[in-house]
Amino acid sequence: MKYIQSTDNKYIKLVKSLQHGKYRQKYSMFFDEGIKNIKLSLRSNYKMDFVLIREDFKDTSLIKKLEERLGKDNILVLNEEIFTSISDTVNSQGIIAVFDMKKNEDIKSDKLLILDRIQDPGNIGTIIRTAESFSINTIFYTKGTADVFSPKVVRATMGSIYFVNFVKLEDISKLKSEGYKIYASCLENAISSKSAFTDEKMALILGNESVGISEDLINQSDKKIKIDMTGNAQSLNVATAGAILIYEMCK
């Protein structure tokens, strides 16, 4: 293991830069914090570049696994002050890993998600986690959607991000030409979601927290669906609605 004693170190500067979207895109890299997430990442095909641990980090079995994967020279030890300067969490567990972003892969699922301009990192992370738990491994996103590799989104996925393929949606007609039926979650002129998911290949659109799905995507959808509600609430949080609809699509 290597000991780093200055915030001027190139690895420290890199991790600090990865807190900003433009540098994540520039370097095609992102980072994650937390023991559980990093353990899960070891089961994926994401390339881990290096790990930073706080000097009081105690999980020796995880350190051993990381040394086997990366070599000792890519395990970097920091004192508490330097580690705190790069940590994105209030109560860090003392470990940060840096990864290469994975290039888009071929669609592997008959059931897909499309995120349309969703902004809240917590919502996106929860949706990713829910989708992966039902074996949805490809998620499309439109321009205006928050960065799925931002630290808050990555942490909120609780490790599910390492098992999902992310693709920017350029033209929904391409999905339709490949046999996918498009389901738009909206309130107007919509049918009940309980019995709506009847196609073999389906793509579910979840829309922006405030304005919902864009008119263009709604117009190109094959079915408009809504969740039956019996109480007084007029709508649900997008992550909550997404969980219900993902379950109904996959059951």
Give the positions of each predicted feature:
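Amphipathic alpha-helical repeat scaffolds
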Residues: 34, 119, 123-126, 236-239
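Structured adenosyl-cofactor binding patch, chiefly the S-adenosyl-L-methionine
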Residues: 130-134, 145, 153-162, 215-251
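Glycine/small-residue-rich loop that forms an oxyanion/phosphate-binding "nest" at active or ligand-binding sites
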Residues: 75-96
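Boundary-proximal intrinsically disordered activation/regulatory segments immediately upstream
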Residues: 1-58, 145-146
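RNA substrate-binding interface of SAM-dependent RNA methyltransferases
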Residues: 98, 106-189
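Active-site/ligand-binding-proximal alpha/beta "capping" segment
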Residues: 185-233
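Short, aromatic/basic amphipathic alpha-helical patches
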Residues: 60-70, 217
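Short acidic-hydrophobic, aromatic-tinged amphipathic segments that line or gate anion-handling sites
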Residues: 3-5, 76-79, 164-171
